[in-house]
Amino acid sequence: MRFDVITLFPELFGPFLVSGVTRRAYETGLVEVKLWNPRDFAEGSYRRVDDRPFGGGPGMVMMAEPLTLCLEQIRAERTAGGVADVPTVLFSPIGEALNHAGVEAWSASSGAVLVCGRYEGLDQRFIETHIDRQISLGDFVLSGGEIAAMALLDAVARLQPGVLNDEGSHQLDSFNPALDGLLDCPHYTRPESWRGQPVPPILLSGNHAQIERWRREERLALTQRQRPELVQKARAAGHLTARDEAFLADLFENPEQDA
C-alpha cells in the first residue's frame, strides 16, 4: 500500500519513519510513504501557499491552486506507476472519528492521499472538488494535520504482517474484536514487588485458565468504569457470556470490588 502525504512540513515525518517497531513497515515497503510539499507547486519567488480569508477574520487560508497542482502530480505519478487509485483524505475536526474498525479497513486498503491542513484551514473549493473523506482524531484542534497523519500511518503499519515482534500482539489491543471490543487489562512485569506494591497473585500462579479469567474480568471492569458504552456494544453483539454478565451484575452490587 502507498500513502502520499501532502504537507508543508515534510521534515516532521523524518524521525517518525525511522523510529520504533513500525519503521519495519516503512523500510520494507509494506507501507510506502511519499511526502509532497505544496510549496513546490506554488508560483512566485516566495512560493506562497496561503492568503487572507475573504470576508476578514484572523489567520490565513491555504490556497486551492498549489494544493490542486500537487494532487494532480500525485495522481499522475500513481497512474504512470500502475498504483491503484485511492481516496483523498483531509484531517479535520468535522471529520468522522478514527477508530479501530477504521484502522483495520485502512490497513487492508491500497492506501490514500493524506492532506495535512495548516493555519485556518483549506480553501473550501479545494475540499469540495477533491476531498473524498475527512477524518478526525477527536473533539480538539491541532496546529496541523501532520500528527493526525502520523497517528493513522502508525496504526496501519502495526497491523501489517511481520511488523510487530509477536504476530498476535495487536489482537490483544484495546478495541480489537479478539477482545470483543473491550479495553485491555492491566499488565505487570518484574520485580514481583515494587515499592511495597505486589503483582496480583493470580498472575504468578501458573494456572492459565484462572489467569485468562482474571484478565477477562479486569477488561470488563475497566471497560465498564471507563467506557461503559463499549460494554453495551459487546452485549448487543452477543459477546458477553452468562459468566461475564454475572460478574458485571456483582460489580454493580459491590462497586468497591472495582478499585
Swiss-Prot record:
GO terms for cellular component: cytosol. S-adenosyl-L-methionine binds at residues 117, 137-142. It is an enzyme of class 2 (transferase). The keyword Repeat does not apply. It is found in: Cytoplasm. Its main location: cytoplasm. Its EC number is 2.1.1.228. One of its GO terms (biological process) is tRNA N1-guanine methylation. One of its GO terms (molecular function) is tRNA (guanine(37)-N1)-methyltransferase activity. Keywords: Cytoplasm, Methyltransferase, S-adenosyl-L-methionine, Transferase, tRNA processing. It catalyses: guanosine(37) in tRNA + S-adenosyl-L-methionine = N(1)-methylguanosine(37) in tRNA + S-adenosyl-L-homocysteine + H(+). Specifically methylates guanosine-37 in various tRNAs. This is tRNA (guanine-N(1)-)-methyltransferase. The gene is trmD.
